[in-house]
Amino acid sequence: VASESHRHSHTVFHPHRGAWLRSKAPRWGWSEENMFECQVVARQMVTAVKPVMDRVKDAEVRDQLKRVSLSVLLNIAEANARRGKDRSNRFGIAEGSAREAEEAVWTAIAWGFVSKDEAREVLSLLDRVIAMLVRLRFPRKK
């Protein structure tokens, strides 16, 4: 039988140390490790969205995608310095921005600027960030 700490542990990549580390933080819910992991995935999303943005010919959609992608990352970073409801609100703003970014990517696909294959990585990362933000805002009850 797995111990309680083992059942709730997971690995998190720590870029400053350049290694995967085992985290004993709860898999879901707020913890420094989970918030850091969310920020790392958001950084990956911002990197992956750039080639998609560059293909979008409509300036309004491109600019909105740029703004909301950056908003996701910056609001997660700002949540790190907050406590209580203010932290939850920042996660909520980041989640809303991630959902906007997702719709902007789907619009770019619908309008023929990028294919689903070209946008697959960005959509996958956005989906992951949204799921993490929901769990950071609304941790599961034991």
Show which residues each predicted segment covers:
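Amphipathic alpha-helical assembly/interaction segments
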Residues: 1-142
